[in-house]
Amino acid sequence: MQLVAYGAQDVYLTGNPQITFWKVTYRRHTNYAMESIEQTFNGQADFGRRVTCTVSRNGDLAFRTYLQVTLPEINQSMVTTDDEKNTTGCFARWLDCPGEQLISQVEVEIGGQRIDRQYGDWMHIWNQLTLTSEQEVGYNKMIGNTTQLTYLTDPSYAAVDGPCESSAPKQVCAPRNALPETTLYVPLQFWFCRNPGLALPLIALQYHEVKINLDLRPIDECLFAVNNTNSGSGSVKATTAYNQSLVAASLYVDYIFLDTDERRRMAQNPHEYLIEQLQFTGDESVGSSSNKIKLNFNHPCKELVWVVQPDANVDYCASLEGGQDLYHLFGAQPFNYSDALDSLPNALLAFSASARGADNVINSNLFDDAGAGAVDGATDEATNIGAGLAVDATSGSTVSDAGSFVLAETALTMHCWGENPVVTAKLQLNGQDRFSEREGTYFDLVQPFQHHTRHPDTGINVYSFALRPEEHQPSGTCNFSRIDNATLQLVLSNATVSGTATAKVRVYATNYNVLRVMSGMGGLAYSN
């Protein structure tokens, strides 16, 4: 009956059919092989240094590229007794997302010409917009955003498991008195890393070398390590911890090996690639509520992404001074783009007042405490957290050790911070409004909802000229090369710039360009 119930409208659906659901079809691909090969840097890669990797010609194409870096162990031997500082041990944590924070900037150059430059800050923002929920847990482990690395250590916690600590608990959930030596894998986001059709044709670049230059941040901007957690004033910096070096650092490149015919064509024929670049003209310091940010961009841009970060969020020096808010919150907050500090610190004691002391996790190395117990008072650290901040741990009941672990893991990507510093924003092109003035929430809620995979953290603002800016296929651009004067007008919240408070505005733009490869050399078709 269904088959014979056929009318004029069905012609639009099944007339002159082009496919069938009942016989699978597929397309044959060219033969190839892929292998990931380690590449070394020229010189010692360490905190605060710039190193270069010359990409060797191991294969025909270069595809996905990862930074592999091993963080040093930070343990209780890295503290010296100082009565004036009331030293009680080494309390340390890597700042959030250490793999991304470690990268100040990374750039790729071909034949001495810089083709693209990206930043750890941008990599964090991009993943906030594009990373799927299924990939989030694995990606966080790759870049070290785990409780093992970013939660505060304590001398009363269990030792790090290893050959010399046979009595240490094997469970990764047990709180530790040290930050373990850990290898991170940070995927780079260059155009050739994200799309196999844009893989870099090394076989066609016989006369031009491909180099990747990496600038690493100083350890002071990656680590929080103090001698005690209840100091009222003065420096409590655990100096020895800040003298550590990276254990190892290298790049892993996925090389593609082509079959004979395709390899010959790839080497002999000229190529044009539509590539994506990142533009960033540097931080702009602001101290008033109304600001005009000049956009010195070029080329057809897919979208604008901007953040406004209060300087108080990233005061690395203040975080090591007793009595300061960032000291009570255990370190600077480089990926906090809101107008207030994140008052949910990365420490077990934020969830259980008994965490700082001898409890079942430390004594038995297992979660034996099945229930919560009453607390008559709070520990020194819990009291200090509550001082002047939106956390009150001075009364109430603790939770079990297992509960503390579950809360810590759950809260790893949660935040108790402020609002979007951008109250309103407007883009002007050659003096004309590109759109009417909008509230800041439109740019960190509605625009990401329309154009991106994921809703980002508060304060990551987006305006997209494309329908699908995450895709390589162009779906809309604005050619900033043809615009003489582009201005982003921002009105900032009082919490961001009240009194003498200042902030940094960072505006990023993703654009298209053309990479031409011919006669063994490569270069951009359009310069700035």
Task: Give each language-model segment a name.
Residues M1-N528:
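Short, low-complexity Pro/Thr/Gly
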